[in-house]
Amino acid sequence: MGEELKTLKRTCMCGGLTEANIGDKITVMGWVQRKRNLGGLVFVDLRDRTGILQIVFGEAINKEAFEKSDSVKSEYCIAAVGTIVKRESPNMEIPTGMVELKGEYIKIFSESETPPIYIKENLDAAENIRLKYRYLDLRRPDMQRIFMLRHKTAKVIRDFLDEQGFLEIETPILGKSTPEGARDYLVPSRNYKGKYYALPQSPQLFKQLLMVSGYDRYFQIAKCFRDEDLRANRQPEFTQVDMEISFVDQEEVMDLNERLIQRVFKQILDVDVKLPIERMTYKTAMDKYGSDKPDLRFGMEINDISEVVKGVDFKVFQNALENGGSVRAIKVTGSAALGRKQLDKLVEFVKTYGASGLIWMAYKKEGIKCSISKFLTEEDTQNILNKMEAAEGDLILIVADKNKVVFESLGALRIHMAKQTGILEGNNDFKFVWITEFPLLSYNEEENRYQAEHHPFVMPMDEDIQYLESNPEKVRAKAYDIVLNGEELGGGSIRIHDTKLQEKMFGAIGISKDTAWNKFGYFLEALKFGPPPHGGLAYGFDRMIMFLAGTDNIKDVIAFPKNQNAFCPLTEAPNSVDKSQLKDLGIEVK
């Protein structure tokens, strides 16, 4: 039976005690990291979320406390009272290593069974075990640092936005289902049988309604939900830093947000982000990097060599160019020595992105080796090398296909080769870039209709509105993403604030006027009552914390995450429910 706290009060945390505290009488509380009995002395390392403090109990100090201390084991929850003294054998690996607590009293609040995982840094344990015993996993110092960092980051963001005149306003969790994009999580209504609420994928329409309501500057650290197949670093529930601003243009939104980014990275990591952050159009990003999320920490840019090879008698090149595609290449410096097996693996790699194949050209000391050498004249080969500015030791990798396939395959290959060659090892740079002028729409061949690239409420660029009905693919959006080291950190846009233009936008993506009013009538109605020009942005807060904490696993930055199957090993959710509960909801499971 554990002891009660009663009148005992904790006076300080473990991790902040130094030589300046020598002579202080203190009370600390926490968990036993380990215990060592050296005969006449018992040493206990006590841990709380701030760090570890060594406590020494001895017969000569207090016999009762000494005897009681010998009964504790790892992860017992205890309190200790005593005096801070200088440590005879300092431990320079911990901040409190110059001092220790001379233990005069001990209270055992609760005992612990042997933990199924070690409470230590850099734990190497199966993920499902960590998630099943998450409350133990969260005791580990590296995990606790992450959640203290997460708290501090949220505070920095709140403080900055408060300084800028923003109001933090909560929007509903139970909302209306609008089946566009990812699947909604649905919540059946007891009062309205056969009808459902939807959990929000974002606060998009509510924050726009707040602009119509005259609140000018809104923000929220919002929980969002998407019932989608989980890829790496996706969770069914996640957190956004969401904001919306009235009477602004795109540059004003971007300017405010890069100042927010600068503040966060300075206060959390002491990293100076130089402003203004580089701007790059979507077209430039795709042409040079094959991605709308380019990693600018290294070069290896994509080059269009279509003009150089248009006269080459090689059917793959000819077919690509005749069908409106292109021939493009990347140069991998110092990789000409790659063996045939490695090159064959690269061929298979690009095929996973839809490419029909990969042509390689290795500039070796003994000459040029090429996978299509029999189709190239010496002049053809030299023209390609000149266009790529290749030198001895370089490897040229070429894809010829439809532009979409070329960009996706070479963009992915560029990242793959950067990892394979190790050029990013030890690179701790933070390379930000704004991507702008996205396509407003893209064509979905499966559904035989256009769909919104971001969402249906994005304002087209002024000069492109005229093409919305006649040539939709030509229309660019007033949209902007902030990208960091090849990952989207956040994204936003200027919004449509005109009912007729919003109806026209719905029409462009195959939503009739009647359907639009049925799904979004409350919003379209609001646009009739003097909506201001407005725009906003949302950050993936979990992803932001991943960057700041230096982890590549989203589960590390969420206290109680789901696994890859959207299942919680800790609570075993989702679970079956009583038939009586289903009956109340008018639901029958067959």
Curated annotation (Swiss-Prot):
Pfam families: GAD, tRNA-synt_2, tRNA_anti-codon. It comes from the Bacteria. It catalyses: tRNA(Asp) + L-aspartate + ATP = L-aspartyl-tRNA(Asp) + AMP + diphosphate. It is an enzyme of class 6 (ligase). L-aspartate binds at E180, R226, H454, R495. GO terms for molecular function: aspartate-tRNA ligase activity; ATP binding; catalytic activity, acting on a protein; nucleic acid binding; transferase activity. Residues 204-207 are annotated as: Aspartate. CDD domains: AspRS_core, EcAspRS_like_N. SUPFAM superfamilies: Class II aaRS and biotin synthetases, GAD domain-like, Nucleic acid-binding proteins. ATP binds at R226, D227, E228, Q235, E488, G540, F541, D542, R543. Keywords: Aminoacyl-tRNA synthetase, ATP-binding, Cytoplasm, Ligase, Nucleotide-binding, Protein biosynthesis. It is found in: Cytoplasm. One of its GO terms (biological process) is aspartyl-tRNA aminoacylation. Its EC number is 6.1.1.12. InterPro entries: Aa-tRNA-synt_II, aa-tRNA-synth_II, aa-tRNA-synth_II/BPL/LPL, Asp-tRNA-ligase_1, Asp-tRNA-ligase_1_N, Asp/Asn-tRNA-synth_IIb, AspRS_core, GAD-like_sf. Belongs to the class-II aminoacyl-tRNA synthetase family. Type 1 subfamily. Catalyzes the attachment of L-aspartate to tRNA(Asp) in a two-step reaction: L-aspartate is first activated by ATP to form Asp-AMP and then transferred to the acceptor end of tRNA(Asp). Homodimer. This is Aspartate--tRNA ligase. The gene is aspS.
